[in-house]
Amino acid sequence: MDIHNKARIHWACRRGMRELDISIMPFFEHEYDSLSDEEKRIFVRLLQSDDPDLFNWLMNHGKPADAELEQMVRLIQTRNRERGPVAI
């Protein structure tokens, strides 16, 4: 997926679990443009993960084996925590 195709990435952020939508969509909407191209590539790669894996990682019930994905999960958690609750 092209890191500059924001419409497609936005669609990929929409998941089958509300808990994931609450974590991923605000991060995309508020933070994606400020990421480096490399971070954008990693974020897009993270979106290719299965919902149960994403849920477990974002809820701290495990972590990805891939160090880059683990770093992106931590970044999502940190930025969401700093920003606070966002209405969906």
UniProtKB/Swiss-Prot annotation:
<dbReference type="GO" id="GO:0006105">
    <property type="term" value="P:succinate metabolic process"/>
</dbReference>
<comment type="subunit">
    <text>Monomer.</text>
</comment>
<comment type="similarity">
    <text>Belongs to the SdhE FAD assembly factor family.</text>
</comment>
<comment type="function">
    <text>An FAD assembly protein, which accelerates covalent attachment of the cofactor into other proteins. Plays an essential role in the assembly of succinate dehydrogenase (SDH, respiratory complex II), an enzyme complex that is a component of both the tricarboxylic acid cycle and the electron transport chain, and which couples the oxidation of succinate to fumarate with the reduction of ubiquinone (coenzyme Q) to ubiquinol. Required for flavinylation (covalent attachment of FAD) of the flavoprotein subunit SdhA of SDH and other flavinylated proteins as well.</text>
</comment>
<dbReference type="InterPro" id="IPR036714">
    <property type="entry name" value="SDH_sf"/>
</dbReference>
<protein>
    <recommendedName>
        <fullName>FAD assembly factor SdhE</fullName>
    </recommendedName>
</protein>
<dbReference type="GO" id="GO:0005737">
    <property type="term" value="C:cytoplasm"/>
</dbReference>
<dbReference type="InterPro" id="IPR005631">
    <property type="entry name" value="SDH"/>
</dbReference>
<keyword id="KW-0143">Chaperone</keyword>
<keyword id="KW-0963">Cytoplasm</keyword>
<dbReference type="Pfam" id="PF03937">
    <property type="entry name" value="Sdh5"/>
</dbReference>
<dbReference type="InterPro" id="IPR050531">
    <property type="entry name" value="SdhE_FAD_assembly_factor"/>
</dbReference>
